[in-house]
Swiss-Prot record:
Subunit structure: Part of the 30S ribosomal subunit. Contacts proteins S3 and S10.
Alphabetical list of Pfam families matching this protein: Ribosomal_S14 (PF00253)
Gene3D superfamilies (alphabetical): 30s Ribosomal Protein S14, Chain N
Binding site for Zn(2+): 24, 27, 40, 43
Name used for this protein in its record: Small ribosomal subunit protein uS14
Family: Belongs to the universal ribosomal protein uS14 family. Zinc-binding uS14 subfamily.
Organism: Mycoplasmopsis agalactiae (strain NCTC 10123 / CIP 59.7 / PG2) (Mycoplasma agalactiae)
GO-annotated biological processes: translation
UniProt KW keywords: Metal-binding, Ribonucleoprotein, Ribosomal protein, RNA-binding, rRNA-binding, Zinc
Amino acid sequence: MAKSSLKAKQKKHAKFSTRAYTRCELCGRVHAVLRKYKICRICFRELAHQGKIPGMKKASW
């Protein structure tokens, strides 16, 4: 898990655009963050299973 200091650091505006990085707003994870929802794949999956993301349902084909 990310430290609270890293979460606070990420909220500040980066001086250069290349220094900016995405971080999950719920758990602080850096990898596999969905930009549209601003959460990581793990949190996204949990919220989708709980039905907290409108219009999202498990794919079946």
